[in-house]
Design a protein with these regions (language model features):
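Short, electropositive alpha-helical surface patch
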Residues: 58-77, 164-165, 215-224, 247-256
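Active-site gating/metal-coordination segments in enzymes
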Residues: 61-147, 153-155, 197-201, 208-209
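An N-terminally biased module of ancient metal coordination in phosphate/nucleic-acid-related enzymes
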Residues: 1-68, 251
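Mid-to-C-terminal alpha-helical segments outside catalytic/metal-binding sites
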Residues: 1-4, 29-47, 221, 225-232, ...
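A generic "structured core" feature
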Residues: 2-11, 15, 41, 113, ...
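Catalytic pocket-lining loop regions of alpha/beta-barrel enzymes
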Residues: 121-232
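Conserved, mostly hydrophobic/aromatic
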Residues: 7, 48, 67, 81, ...
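Active-site environment of divalent metal-dependent phosphoester hydrolases
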Residues: 11-14, 55-58, 88-91, 113-116, ...
Length: 280
């Protein structure tokens, strides 16, 4: 089965700084395209979408331009770039004007789980996210489970924007806490302009003793809520390596979904990504 990875990261510490890596020594080194290709080897990953990795703000524009150049190179699967952005800023539109126009630029992400809740609730933030529609860009939502009501409000105010919820809304997998995450997901899934990325969950599991069964209730509820036409596979590499290899995560998700049949698995691992991220 061909795979489109809708959530890969790269970071080059010789070029840019990512302050959050200081607290994660396992990840605090450069991860470049050759490393990604080695991790995905043999898994038939035919395309990928790069998600910004919360680069320090002074490097946002340079990182985006660097990734767009990389996406144009012929020897890698990069088909789309989701760039870093600050919708809470009054200068957001001028920032967008500097990066739009490249066909591989697909969307914007602002990591909210590291920010005060007021950031995602702000009037300027919501107005600027709503404006992404006019740029032809989507928005990746990256929040903790407790912040999902913020995501629900945001989506309700931006009916024309394509939204992708990253990491199933970051449930507490290790602690096996399903509620209130479960009801929030059910509510968010009512908005048909939102898709859910089945990604990141293995990184939130117990790194020493996780199994596919630990992930299953979260994955099955997300899929049941959004349906097979609005779920996407993402590796979250290299963050997934905190608990599992790229291959281990893929095989766990394939095992969890094998009873759904080949057509639905193909939607999850490939077809939906083409539509949601507007890939070739």
């Amino acid at each position: 089965m061909q795979i489109i990875d809708t959530h890969q990261h790269l970071w080059d510490l010789d070029l840019f700084r990512y302050a959050w890596l200081d607290s994660l020594p396992e990840l605090n080194r450069s991860f470049r395209m050759p490393d990604y290709l080695a991790a995905a080897e043999g898994l038939n990953v035919v395309k990928s979408v790069h998600l910004e990795a919360d680069v320090d703000e002074i490097y946002m524009l340079d990182e985006t331009r660097h990734l767009l150049v990389l996406a144009d190179e012929p020897d890698n699967p990069l088909e789309g770039i989701v760039a870093c952005g600050r919708p809470e800023s009054k200068d957001f539109n001028s920032y967008l004007d500097k990066i739009v126009g490249h066909p591989r630029l697909k969307g914007i992400r602002r990591v909210l789980h590291t920010q005060p809740d007021e950031v995602g609730r702000g009037t300027t933030f919501i107005k600027n996210v709503a404006a992404l529609f006019s740029y032809g860009l989507s928005f990746d939502i990256c929040v903790l489970a407790r912040q999902l009501p913020i995501a629900i409000k945001l989506v309700s105010k931006c009916p024309d924007v394509i939204f992708i919820l990253d990491h199933c809304g970051v449930p507490q997998v290790k602690e096996r806490i399903l509620d209130p995450w479960r009801s929030y997901i059910t509510e968010l899934a009512k908005f048909t302009n939102v898709s859910c990325k089945i990604s990141g969950l293995v990184a939130y599991a117990d790194p020493k003793r996780w199994s596919a069964e630990d992930l299953r209730p979260f994955i099955e509820h997300a899929i049941a809520s959004f349906g097979w036409d609005r779920v996407l596979f993402g590796s979250d590499w290299p963050v997934c390596t905190l608990s599992a290899s790229y291959r281990q995560w893929v095989e766990a998700l394939q095992a969890i979904t094998q009873g759904a049949g080949e057509v639905n698995q193909r939607k999850l691992f490939h077809d939906n990504a083409v539509r949601v991220y507007r890939l070739s």
